Amino acid sequence: METQRASLCLGRWSLWLLLLGLVVPSASAQALSYREAVLRAVDRLNEQSSEANLYRLLELDQPPKADEDPGTPKPVSFTVKETVCPRPTWRPPELCDFKENGRVKQCVGTVTLNPSNDPLDINCDEIQSVGRFRRLRKKTRKRLKKIGKVLKWIPPIVGSIPLGCG
């Protein structure tokens, strides 16, 4: 009789814990904002860089139109600038001042808003002068338009691929 009561009580606690787990979303399961995803991409850029100083987000271009799926790659375009913080300190770049006459890079590619996925395909080119900057921005916008067009076609293509044996 005592074991039945203990088992029933344990079952109730298990049910409560299960319901609590379903109701309270975990922090890792929540989608990132567009800006947060770009900041993660900048962090990744700093991790993979062999340069002496950290880079920090200087300018973020307009986000793409809203897409409900956080796992879908989103086209992104942003500019980073070299800071005064040396890379080995691993200080958060947001706390670092921009370096006077520091390098500026224009970055394009795709990111996902799903925090469990790493940023995808980010390429950065150093900006040399104002004239080149304008040309680079034009190229960047063209690349983003192409990426956006390709991403629009992915769901219909994937949906038309037969997955079963027959």
From Swiss-Prot:
GO cellular component terms attached to this protein's record: extracellular space
SUPFAM superfamilies reported for this sequence: Cystatin/monellin
One of the protein's GO biological processes: defense response to Gram-positive bacterium
Disulfide bridge partners, by residue number: 85-96, 107-124
Signal peptide interval: 1-29
Subcellular compartments: Secreted
GO molecular function: lipopolysaccharide binding
Propeptide: 30-129
Keyword terms of this UniProt record: Antibiotic, Antimicrobial, Disulfide bond, Secreted, Signal
InterPro entries associated with the record: Cathelicidin-like, Cathelicidin_CS, Cystatin_sf
Family named by the database record: Belongs to the cathelicidin family.
Summary of the function given for this chain in its UniProt record: Exerts antimicrobial activity against both Gram-positive and negative bacteria. Its activity appears to be mediated by its ability to damage bacterial membranes.
Descriptive protein name: Antibacterial peptide PMAP-36
Gene that encodes it: PMAP36
